């Protein structure tokens, strides 16, 4: 009887300390997205070259043919306004 009076409270304490398993919280959605001009440069087989300017850092795209062009100039050249 003494064993039961000792074991039972110990089991109750241990049961109270355990936490129920909960499913993982869903990951928050990504707010940002990749720079479309940078992605387009890489899709064309180009490499990005960072260039320091007075306004900050911008990227040039060096295309496989050897042409180097600002990544946004490349984007605008190949995606004219009004074209979808």
From Swiss-Prot:
InterPro entries assigned: DUF333 (IPR005590)
Domain of life: Bacteria
PROSITE patterns named in the record: PROKAR_LIPOPROTEIN
Protein name as annotated: Uncharacterized protein YoaF
Lineage: Bacteria, Pseudomonadati, Pseudomonadota, Gammaproteobacteria, Enterobacterales
Gene designation: yoaF
């Amino acid at each position: 009887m003494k064993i039961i009076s000792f074991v039972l409270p110990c089991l109750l304490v241990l049961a109270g300390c355990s936490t129920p398993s909960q499913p993982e919280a869903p990951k928050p959605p990504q707010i940002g997205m990749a720079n479309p001009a940078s992605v387009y440069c890489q899709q064309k087989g180009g490499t990005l070259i960072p260039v320091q300017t007075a306004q900050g850092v911008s990227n040039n795209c060096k295309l496989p043919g050897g042409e180097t062009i600002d990544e946004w100039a490349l984007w605008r050249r190949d995606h004219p306004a009004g074209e979808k």
